[in-house]
């Protein structure tokens, strides 16, 4: 990011800091207990019904409303993502202060390596945080679920999950506003952010994104949000469960892309100047150690998964050692 923009962001973050919640300013694992009618909530995953739950953490108790969320994951997950709705007067002087509606990414399935996909998707968000300030922050949770209905195989069980910063909180933090439009002009995008997104998606092996509105979406863009900051728009990606880095058990590439596995990298960025691509590549390469440390520091990830994930990321960095070659690849493949 150019120095002028960096200084602007630092000032904006400083101004909004006083009203920000501590929830996303801490990277330690937050222990919570979520108690409620889980099996009733999952009776009809296509419903948006909200049910009362109790969330306990740090010796505090919050009465919240919970509903199922997500699109594709409702279809493939036995334990789909959730939305937690907090009462405004119930979060004062807690880690959830100033929070209202929060997205919770859950473990999805209990098969195989239960925690691996969740932890690696969390890592994808953290990696993007390292290369762009305009990104969704996340907080890792270790959750004890208690089903008061007793309709699940286990009444009480522990899983990892993570919370995602809301779009309104991100907008306030960076001094911008969320945009809900049906399309976006490439000329309206911040070039540095756009190039960083393109290369980041290639780094994590994610092809499940686009600057075009998807068939089942009302607004632009597929698996990304737009934010107006100053006179330009910033594309902020989310939903990385189909990325090669995560390699979720249910992940399959779009048949039109002509790749057989999600772990195969395919550049899906749009055409942009060589200088901007080089700058974005340098930004990502400069965080190589920090990026790999995100994986090394994941709690609950097996040694086998940790090594395999680091090797996957290192494959990118080895290719990126020849900057001219990889940028030429990007330019040949750009849309």
What is each of the regions a protein language model found here?
Residues 19-335:
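Phosphate/dinucleotide-binding and metal-coordinating scaffold of catalytic cores
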């Amino acid at each position: 990011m150019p120095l002028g923009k960096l200084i602007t962001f630092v000032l904006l973050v400083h101004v909004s800091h006083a009203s920000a919640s501590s929830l996303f300013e801490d990277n330690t694992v937050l222990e919570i207990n979520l108690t409620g009618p889980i099996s009733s909530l999952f009776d009809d995953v296509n419903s948006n019904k909200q049910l009362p739950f109790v969330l306990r953490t740090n010796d505090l108790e919050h009465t919240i409303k919970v509903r199922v969320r997500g699109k594709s994951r409702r279809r493939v997950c036995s334990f789909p993502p959730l939305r937690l709705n907090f009462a405004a007067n119930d979060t004062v002087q807690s880690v959830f202060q100033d929070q209202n509606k929060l997205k919770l990414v859950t473990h999805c399935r209990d098969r195989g390596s239960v925690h691996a996909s969740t932890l690696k998707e969390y890592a994808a968000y953290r990696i993007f945080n390292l290369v762009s300030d305009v990104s969704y922050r996340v907080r890792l949770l270790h959750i004890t679920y208690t089903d008061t209905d007793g309709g699940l195989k286990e009444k009480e069980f522990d899983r990892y999950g993570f919370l995602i910063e809301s779009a309104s909180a991100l907008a306030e933090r960076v001094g911008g506003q969320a945009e809900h439009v049906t399309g976006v002009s490439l000329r309206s995008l911040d070039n540095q952010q756009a190039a960083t997104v393109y290369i980041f998606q290639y780094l994590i092996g994610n092809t499940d994104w686009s600057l075009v509105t998807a068939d089942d979406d009302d607004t632009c863009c597929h698996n990304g949000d737009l934010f107006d900051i100053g006179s330009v728009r910033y594309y902020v990606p989310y939903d990385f469960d189909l990325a090669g880095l995560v390699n979720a058990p249910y992940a399959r590439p779009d048949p039109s892309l002509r790749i057989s596995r999600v772990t195969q990298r395919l550049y899906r960025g749009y055409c942009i100047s060589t200088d901007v691509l080089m700058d974005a590549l340098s930004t990502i390469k400069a965080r190589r150690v920090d990026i790999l440390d995100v994986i090394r520091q994941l709690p609950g990830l097996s040694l086998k998964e940790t090594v395999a994930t680091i090797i996957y990321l290192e494959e990118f960095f080895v290719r990126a050692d020849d900057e001219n070659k990889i940028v030429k690849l990007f330019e040949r493949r750009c849309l």
